[in-house]
Amino acid sequence: MQVKERCFGMSENKFIKRILVWPNITFYKDLTQDSFVQTIHRMIVELKKIRDDIYWDLILPDKSEVVYIFSYENVNIHRIPWPSFIQSTRGHFDTSQIDEITKYGNWNFEDIDLIFSHLPESTWNLVNHLGNRWHHIPPILTYSHWFDFSTICNWKYPAFMRECEGVSLSEKCYVNTESQKQLVLSEAKEYFSEQFVDKLNSKIEPFHLPVLDNEVQNDINTNTEKIIVFNHRTKVYKDFNNIVNKVLDPLWEKRKDFKVWIPLLDIQTISNSWKHRDYIDNTKYDKNGYYKQLKKCRVGISPKQKYAGWSVATTDGMMNGCPFIMYDADYYKELYPNGDFFGDYDSAVTLLEKYLDDESYRNKEGKKSLEYVKNSLTWGVKSSKLSHDITNIIDNTKSYDTNKKGYIKLVEDIKNKTMTKKEVISRRWGSSIKFTPYRKALMDDERISYYKNKENWVYEYKGKK
């Protein structure tokens, strides 16, 4: 996807900050529904509302259906072949593809100010390859959506140690919850020294994934149907089988006046082993239809998790006015501390019956959880933190001494002629000298702007301080 014709950042005389995003694809068959794609799209949209000095170089699998959602003048998509098998992505790193998208030898891509890695397993590969190829080693911000905990993984070679290595190379690493951070630190003690675990502790912090302000409903639907929603993944780590066998089946035995909507339950499972469960509905909708159906539901259920992650399924319901009963655990209390919690399966059955029978209570809880989302869980509330962290990490990059002759000569050359990165580098020093401190000094120099013209990113002299 090409940058639009007009020159990005030129008219504002800004020094544009560039962020290279490394992906973590887990839903290859429909990238529009992939959690990473949705998350980075939200970040781009929300940051664009509060600042106009960021340009995103976004790496995505070579599929066309997601390009349209990133049609912004400050985004460029670089599409490369990508494994469809999740475990293969853990070790996937094609240096020839990286060289192609970074235009190695063309000098048109290398002024990156921050690497935003969503796959910490690949971070060492990135800094090793790009650091040796480039004159420039930018700092790293990581967002880990997943860790290969031993209590979850049933494959032979989990990537937990490589994930921790990637975190250690970052300036900061976001995880979904404080509970998840504690799981990482606890398991890391089995493999690493106390000093290394302390390093992880200093770098990892929770980033509670917000919802889009414009997708939050103004009010609840007070005329709901007797539908219980389980909109989580139907996996063991989401306690799915126990929820069905120990909560939903017993509830159906007691009363047959409700349905359970499980949109992520696949048709193969339904047809082969679920025919006797007449209460199950696995109808799938597009995004608008999904939200519309959530508004009709009486209550949702959020299960025990082995992963202690943030539950987007729960916030999806809450922002549409559907209250959720939640397993009594810290990771749900981080999400919504004022909800109804169950400590065992019998308690879950009791709570579900209360919501099915007492619509007035249900509506009160739905309104409470909706108001909590509006006040605490929207991007309007959270985007300033992300913006601050990006600025802080870039600002803390070491800068070159602007009083030295090398920098003074560099500025004089830019003053005499607007220069591309190739021109800046090729006439000045060899490959052993890194460009990073010079890039930072130019960024901090109010006389210099950096923008995208029709063909290249260029440095331009704008006058005295």
Regions found by a protein language model. Name each.
Residues 38, 360-399, 432:
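A charged, aromatic-enriched C-terminal amphipathic alpha-helix characteristic of glycosyltransferases
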Residues 39, 212-215, 223-274, 281, ...:
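Conserved catalytic-core segment of nucleotide-activated headgroup transferases in glycan assembly
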